[in-house]
Structures are given as C-alpha cells and as structure tokens.
C-alpha cells in the first residue's frame, strides 16, 4: 500500500511539475525519503504489536527464561532472542525491541549484532545474483537446487558471523560477568487491547519522529550525489518528448487509428531507450559515479568494477536500491526488479574493456556475501544512534560490518576464482 501510494504521488508530481531539478528532487528525493521512512512503519508496528501482546499476556518473560542458557553461551541474554529473530524481517524493529533488555551490556551487544541477521531488504540482491549466475544444478535426487543452497547459505552467514562477534564484544567493549537471570514470572492473562495499542502507537511514533528525519536527510543527500553536477538538459527534453508522445498515443487510441498508434509506440520506445542510455551516462558523470571510479582500485580485488561500486554506494539508504541503480547504469531504467530477465541478461553480457566478463558466479557470490555482512542501511544506523544516544556506536557498527563484508567478499571471490580455474 505504501509502495503504491509512493508511486501515485511520484506520478502526480511528474504530471504537474515540468522536467527539471525540482521534479527530480520531489519525485526521486523527497518522496523516496518519506517512503523510506514509512515503508518500515508496518513492520515496526506489527512487531511491537506482537511484542506488546506477549509482554501483556506474560509469555515474553517465559520465552526469555527458556532461551537464556543457550544465549548466555553466545555472550547474550535470553531476552536477546526475540530482537534477533525480529531482525530477520528488519533490523530496525529488532534494534528497537532491545528495549526489553534491562542489562546495558547485553542490550548493547544485541544492538550491535542484530544488523548481521539477513533482513528482507537483502533478498532482492540474493534473488538477482542466484537467478542470473548460479547454475540450476539439482542435488538430493532433485529435491534441492544449487540456487536454493546458496540462498540458504547467505542467511547462515550472518548467524555464523554474529556468534564470534558477540563473544568478542563481551570480551572487549562490554566486559563483565553476566548477571544471574533472575526475574519474576507473571501469571498468564488475556492481554489488554487498550494497553497493547497504546504501546504500539508510542513506539511507532518514536520511530517516525526520531529516526525518520535522519533517514529522510540521508536519502536526499544520496539523491543529490546521484544528480549533480551533470548536465540533465537532454534528459529533460527526452522526458518532455515521451510525455507528449504518450498524450498523442492516448488521443489516437480514442480515434481508433491503430496504424498511427503503432507508429507512435515505436517512436516512444526509441525515446525511452535513449532516455535510459542518457540516465546511465549521467550517473557516471555525477558525484556518485566519480565516487564509484575513485573506489574502483579498492573493490577490484573483489571482482567488482566501478559500476558495482556505484551500486553499493547508492544502496546506503536501503540495500535493495542497488537493483534500481544497476538498472539505470545498464540503461534499463530505474524501474527494473530483481526478477527482471532483461537486467540479468545485461549483467551477464557486461564486459571489462579487455572483453572479459564482469560477472560470473564468483563475483555474484562476492556481492551476496558483502551484502550479507555489510551495514548498507542508513535507517538501521540512525535507529542505533537513537537507541544508544551516541554517534559512536552507529559509526562503530558501520566500520566493523563494512570491514567484515569486505574481507568476506574478498575471500569468497579469490577462492571462487581459484575453483573456477
């Protein structure tokens, strides 16, 4: 619903604001920024609804008690179980759910490892890479395919890495004996609807007010980096021509003039193709493109080129943005999805200047491992800032997760290339 509403508002802006920086700022910057905040709201509200129900009926305390022995061995608390499980859907409500953990050390460790759980935003990256580059070999008598094994492995990566990270955090930054797990087990009772909804409202409002402004600002900054300083004159002219052609097509359809409709559709297709090509060129000429070229020497050992680097930088507001960015760079437009065969085809056909393919299974796995471990989610970092009341911990989270992601992607690519040769 929020996605549809975002598209409706963007279309209204496109219909009423002429092509230019203002339209792009409103449609691609402001609307995307507001959508980037609201898109998390249903997940957060739903999570807090269930947490409030479990708390009010008395089950949450028992779940924490049951899981405490296992979680303590990992350097966490039994109360860390629900926040970490929630992080598989989205790390934002997972981080916010750590409020139920009274012990500061346990809460901080849980906050810092929660983003390692593979959230739903990583799934489009996994789907695109496995669909395009992982062969559909079957195992166990045809019950399991190689893409399914790879996809499942990406979820395991975060869990496996989170265990030593949590242990190291407890041995370094958050030293101290784990206090005995003592708590009063309340009696079971039916939850109060009024109390549950009041908690959901208060916590959801806190997210929108506190983290929303920072998420919005980050989205605007990334938009500006992808828009300036390139000259968009030709792009704006093409957008105007496409809109005029669409009006002409609508008029011809009313007149039932099919031959001219077909001719106009062909002309529109050529204009769209040219617009997508220009959009890709403008990305390269933007500050974002220049950053991609600047980091290319650093990402080349991962098997990446500057285009993949741009996609990674552009995905900082949200990981799934890399799909639209790659679609724009490869002249397919920003509306392509992870299951679009044209994007997979373009990536498969992409080559380096010497003619060697850019993408293969080693590069695809390198990208997936990077996204499984990286902190490419501004919203999560902003929530960590709000929950810890310090910039130190989101910066620390970004640095340690990016380092882990880089090392993991490097090992994956280098080992993969050895196996391929």
Residues of each region from the PLM?
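Hydrophobic core segments of alpha-helical transmembrane domains in multi-pass membrane transport
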Residues: 47-52, 130-133, 154-168, 217-227, ...
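Core transmembrane alpha-helical segments of multi-pass membrane transporters/permeases
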Residues: 4, 8, 12-13, 17, ...
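Transmembrane helix-loop junctions at the membrane interface of multipass transporters and ion channels
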Residues: 102, 116, 120-150, 379-390, ...
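Transmembrane alpha-helix detector for multi-pass membrane proteins
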Residues: 38-54, 60, 74-134, 371-379
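Long hydrophobic segments that form regular secondary structure
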Residues: 143, 166, 170-180, 188-251, ...
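Extended, low-charge hydrophobic alpha-helical regions
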Residues: 1-30, 34, 74, 95-110, ...
């Amino acid at each position: 619903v929020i996605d549809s509403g975002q598209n409706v508002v963007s279309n209204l802006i496109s219909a009423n604001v002429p092509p230019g920086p203002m339209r792009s700022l409103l449609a691609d910057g402001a609307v995307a920024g507001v959508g980037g905040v609201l898109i998390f709201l249903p997940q957060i509200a739903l999570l807090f609804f269930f947490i409030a129900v479990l708390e009010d009926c008395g089950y949450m305390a028992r779940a924490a008690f049951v899981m405490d022995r296992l979680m303590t061995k990992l350097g966490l608390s039994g109360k860390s179980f629900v926040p970490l499980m929630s992080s598989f859907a989205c790390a934002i409500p997972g981080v916010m759910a750590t409020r139920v953990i009274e012990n500061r050390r346990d809460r901080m460790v849980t906050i810092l490892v929660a983003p390692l759980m593979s959230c739903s935003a990583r799934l489009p990256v996994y789907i695109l890479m496995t669909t395009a580059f992982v062969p559909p070999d079957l195992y166990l008598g045809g019950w399991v395919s190689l893409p399914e094994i790879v996809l499942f492995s990406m979820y395991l990566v975060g869990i496996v890495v989170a265990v030593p990270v949590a242990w190291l955090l407890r041995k370094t930054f958050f030293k101290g004996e784990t206090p005995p797990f003592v708590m009063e087990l309340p009696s079971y009772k039916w939850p109060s609807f009024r109390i549950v909804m009041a908690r959901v409202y208060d916590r959801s409002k806190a997210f929108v007010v506190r983290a929303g402004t920072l998420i919005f600002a980050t989205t605007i900054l990334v938009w500006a980096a992808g828009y300036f300083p390139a000259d968009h004159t030709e792009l704006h002219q093409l957008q105007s021509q496409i809109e005029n052609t669409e009006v002409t097509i609508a008029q011809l359809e009313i007149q039932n003039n099919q031959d001219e409709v077909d001719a106009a559709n062909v002309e529109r297709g050529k204009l769209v193709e040219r617009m997508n090509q220009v959009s890709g060129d403008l990305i390269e000429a933007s500050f974002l493109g220049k950053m991609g070229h600047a980091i290319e020497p650093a990402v080349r050992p991962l098997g990446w080129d500057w285009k993949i680097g741009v996609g990674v930088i552009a995905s900082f507001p949200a990981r799934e943005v890399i799909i639209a960015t790659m679609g724009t760079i490869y002249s397919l437009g920003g509306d392509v999805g992870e299951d679009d065969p044209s994007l997979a085809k373009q990536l498969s056909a992409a080559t380096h200047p010497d003619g060697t393919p850019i993408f293969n299974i080693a590069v695809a796995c390198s990208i997936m491992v990077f996204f499984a471990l990286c902190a490419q989610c501004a919203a999560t970092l902003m929530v960590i800032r709000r929950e810890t009341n310090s910039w130190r911990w989101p910066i620390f989270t970004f640095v340690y997760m990016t380092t882990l992601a880089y090392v993991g992607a490097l090992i994956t690519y280098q080992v993969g290339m050895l196996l391929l040769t």
